């Protein structure tokens, strides 16, 4: 099934197209992938954005956190995904400490694009990353900012917890999102925040906001591939869902996920968080 050249049946997804989808009220469907085979399958299912996430440290390498993942590993897995030549836009994570300085950030983002073939990079961090985002934007590198729960800070945060439940924290996150947009971010990933805050930030920005555990009112949704296929060891996060339940095949599960996000059926209240926001 996956030998030879993968079929090209869709127009390529671009940054401009994602922005038009937000303007038109069409939900953006994103999903992680770490290899050629699943990149082909996701593209055929209609996924708009494939994220080569540093989550590979946990779901591929079996580590406890994403912190040990290296730039070399990200380049390798990004290259595997882009070998599928998907119509979906391929976004790659900047791993922990790969953008500790502006020079590091520029160099490693360039590696992910030149060596890995990524079309966008994603980096965690609040308003303090605005200068790097601006530098990357001036260099012609599309950027997805990442706010809310930031897995690379798990040791500082003391675990994986919902962020932005207090009013002051929610206001600060909205201000950070606006600062990152003003600096030149093309996309925002918002993780593990109250649904009301997800709505506020999505409505407060012109760029698309992709949620993961951020409620149904974001401009799109993203989940981890292994979670939606029900193969993640242990419990999956509350905001995720096993789409293999009732599906006859992996491809059917991927299509069910795409349809659920596109229609707005996912996430529902059971897969969202309450709180002040």
Swiss-Prot record:
List, in alphabetical order, the GO biological process terms annotated in this UniProt record: pantothenate biosynthetic process
> According to the UniProt record, what class of enzyme is this?
transferase
Q: How is the cofactor bound?
A: Binds 1 Mg(2+) ion per subunit.
Q: Which domain of life is it from?
A: Bacteria
Return the InterPro entries for the record. Pantoate_hydroxy_MeTrfase (IPR003700), Pyrv/PenolPyrv_kinase-like_dom (IPR015813), Pyrv_kinase-like_dom_sf (IPR040442)
Q: Where does 3-methyl-2-oxobutanoate bind?
A: 54-55, 93, 122
Q: What is its main location?
A: cytoplasm
Q: Which cofactor does it need?
A: Mg(2+)
Q: Give the pathway annotation.
A: Cofactor biosynthesis; (R)-pantothenate biosynthesis; (R)-pantoate from 3-methyl-2-oxobutanoate: step 1/2
Q: Does the keyword Transmembrane helix apply?
A: no
Reactions catalysed:
3-methyl-2-oxobutanoate + (6R)-5,10-methylene-5,6,7,8-tetrahydrofolate + H2O = 2-dehydropantoate + (6S)-5,6,7,8-tetrahydrofolate
Active site residues per record: 191 (proton acceptor)
Q: Where can this protein be found? A: Cytoplasm
* One of the record's GO cellular component terms: cytoplasm
Which keywords accompany this UniProt record?
Cytoplasm, Magnesium, Metal-binding, Pantothenate biosynthesis, Transferase
E.C. number(s) listed in UniProt: 2.1.2.11
Q: Which residues form the signal peptide?
A: none
GO terms, molecular function: 3-methyl-2-oxobutanoate hydroxymethyltransferase activity; magnesium ion binding
Q: Give the residues the record marks as binding Mg(2+).
A: 54, 93, 124
Q: What Pfam families does the entry give?
A: Pantoate_transf (PF02548)
PANTHER family, alphabetically? 3-METHYL-2-OXOBUTANOATE HYDROXYMETHYLTRANSFERASE
This chain's function reads: Catalyzes the reversible reaction in which hydroxymethyl group from 5,10-methylenetetrahydrofolate is transferred onto alpha-ketoisovalerate to form ketopantoate.
> What does the record note on quaternary structure?
Homodecamer; pentamer of dimers.
Q: Which family does it belong to?
A: Belongs to the PanB family.
Q: What's the protein name?
A: 3-methyl-2-oxobutanoate hydroxymethyltransferase
Q: Which gene encodes it?
A: panB
């Amino acid at each position: 099934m996956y030998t030879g050249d993968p079929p090209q049946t869709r127009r390529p997804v671009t940054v401009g197209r994602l922005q038009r989808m937000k303007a038109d009220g069409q939900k953006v469907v994103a999903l992680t992938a770490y290899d050629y085979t699943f990149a082909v399958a996701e593209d055929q299912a209609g996924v708009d954005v494939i994220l080569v996430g540093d989550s590979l440290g946990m779901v591929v390498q079996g580590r406890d956190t994403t912190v040990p993942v290296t730039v070399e590993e990200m380049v390798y897995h990004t290259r595997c995904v882009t070998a599928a030549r998907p119509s979906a836009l391929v976004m790659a994570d900047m791993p922990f400490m790969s953008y500790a300085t502006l020079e590091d950030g520029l160099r490693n983002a360039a590696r992910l694009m030149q060596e890995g073939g990524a079309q966008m990079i994603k980096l965690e961090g609040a308003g303090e990353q605005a200068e790097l985002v601006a530098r990357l934007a001036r260099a012609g590198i599309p950027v997805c900012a990442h706010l809310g729960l930031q897995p690379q800070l798990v040791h500082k945060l003391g675990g994986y917890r919902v962020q932005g439940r207090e009013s002051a924290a929610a206001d600060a996150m909205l201000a950070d999102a606006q600062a990152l947009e003003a600096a030149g971010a093309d996309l925002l990933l918002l993780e593990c925040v109250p649904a009301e805050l997800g709505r506020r930030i999505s409505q407060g920005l012109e760029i698309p906001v992709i949620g993961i555990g951020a409620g149904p009112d974001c401009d799109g949704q993203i989940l981890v591939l292994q979670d939606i296929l029900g193969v993640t060891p242990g419990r999956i996060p509350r905001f995720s869902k096993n789409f293999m339940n009732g599906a006859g095949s992996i491809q059917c599960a991927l299509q069910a996920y795409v349809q659920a996000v596109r229609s707005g059926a996912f996430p529902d209240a059971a897969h969202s968080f309450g709180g002040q926001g």
